[in-house]
């Protein structure tokens, strides 16, 4: 199981949100570049980066920082947040990003997902950020009219190979993942499913590993020191 430490960017700093609320941000590190280097030194196999300004405004507010990390930190990186057209996807892929995450765009523009998968295949992931099983869009401010399982199946049919599932009510809470919803999705599709939101400690990592989940995104737990990244990678990889 791959462990992906998270760097969420807002105003050029690393922040964590509570339950996806943009007004609840806590600055957890002032220098995202140094944070990425630290994660690499601790054995990170992949980095998960989200441009929260972009998620809300639909534009790449933190592109310079992302670019610096991609070019100077020798670890595969996936990036999401505000990526809503093929030009932005092209830009990130050309920059050297290993995987581009579509969220709002996947809910609102299926044609974009089809085109992106045709062009970039496994380099396209879709983030399913759900409230009570309903995918949310526009920086988690609006709810869609579809069920998260149906949406996951629809993305699988298009050819998406990686889904990132977040229960927004768990995000940033350190309360553990919504394992029940996560496993329903995992058992409904053949895609690689990455767990995100709520992971607190090594027991959560062990639970996900036991269920053969493809990956786990860890954020607040690392910054709050309730989870050792090195230990998580050690457990996840064995």
Curated annotation (Swiss-Prot):
Gene Ontology terms, MF aspect: 1-(5-phosphoribosyl)-5-[(5-phosphoribosylamino)methylideneamino]imidazole-4-carboxamide isomerase activity
EC numbers on record: 5.3.1.16
Coiled coil segments of this chain: none
Pathway: Amino-acid biosynthesis; L-histidine biosynthesis; L-histidine from 5-phospho-alpha-D-ribose 1-diphosphate: step 4/9
One Gene Ontology CC term in the entry: cytoplasm
Enzyme's top EC category: isomerase
Domain of life: Bacteria
HAMAP family with a match to the protein in the record: HisA
Entry protein name: 1-(5-phosphoribosyl)-5-[(5-phosphoribosylamino)methylideneamino] imidazole-4-carboxamide isomerase
Highest classification ranks of the organism: Bacteria, Bacillati, Bacillota, Clostridia, Eubacteriales
Name of encoding gene: hisA
